[in-house]
């Protein structure tokens, strides 16, 4: 009886949180395959440079013709013109897309406001031209919904209390799994006993 009570209570109390975690897991894992195409049909999503290019295979990376130093210098100048106050906090190069990304944040603040991440400026790895930007909590309603997926999934959108809630939700999922199996085994045993001839 206690297994059934735990299973039912946790399932009822946390179904909303469990739904959010499940939905955001789907959106993060199947972003380019399902989530982005569906969102683009429902509402206006501003494409990033990664959404407008086809990635190369792992065997055929795009080698950059621009150096990190050159791209970071361009990004600093562009960020100053845009009124960014944070310094360059990091940079990366995606060899599958031929794109540099430069992030702007203070040390230790790489998750930005509400966990949505810092602003990024993107540049072409071949000729260094500016390709676009990603600004946290800016854009269309669909852009903001897309940006909110990781903060919702990780609980960062609510700060430390949200992260604690998501951690506890993981324990609840484990409890639901265990109690679900125990309930199933008891029902199965009862069915088997009923079928046995007297």
Tell me the role of every PLM-derived stretch.
Residues 1-198:
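Conserved histidines in hydrophobic membrane contexts and catalytic metal-binding motifs
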